[in-house]
Amino acid sequence: KVSKNDASEILQVSEYVFSLVKNEFVTKAGVFTGRWFSFKPSREEVEKDSIIIGHRCIPFVNPEVPPDSICVMAEGNVVESSAREFSMNLAMDTFALYGEGYVIPYIFNDKSNTSLALSSVQYSMPQEIRLTCWPLSKISGGKPFHYGDRIICRVISWSDCVVEMKVQDSGLSDMVISDEAVQREEWY
């Protein structure tokens, strides 16, 4: 049996719980399951018809699960991941929110990076690295995906890291930048 004070203390130090007012708490799973969020794939990802998840699902999914193990669903079906070469610059940008000390380990420990060990890197990073990715064509249901379109996401299961994804068409040509897009970029 746990006293009320002990339970409160445990909840206050847990990384899975948000402390509210008047000694009330809510779990991350309770806050983020079913909530919508979005991101805009980079030009490189659009050109390669594949996205890297990286930090884009933080804080919505369980932080104990690495991004290459997240289960992606689209139109009620599991989207199978694959492996593809991406520029190291994109990889570094896409994992940046994990923090400076964690970016490189997350990138090099990706399950698709089977040929390049972190210990083999001497003085400079490789230009490209093989990472786990998900095909945009499967997420978009076979419809064309354009640079500027967004991926709309919703956590289906926080504990199992299941994320539903669909495409929000920007409705703009590649040459037109909307006011909303400018504001979104400024916010990010």
Mark where each language-model region is.
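Acidic, low-complexity intrinsically disordered regions
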Residues: K1-Y188
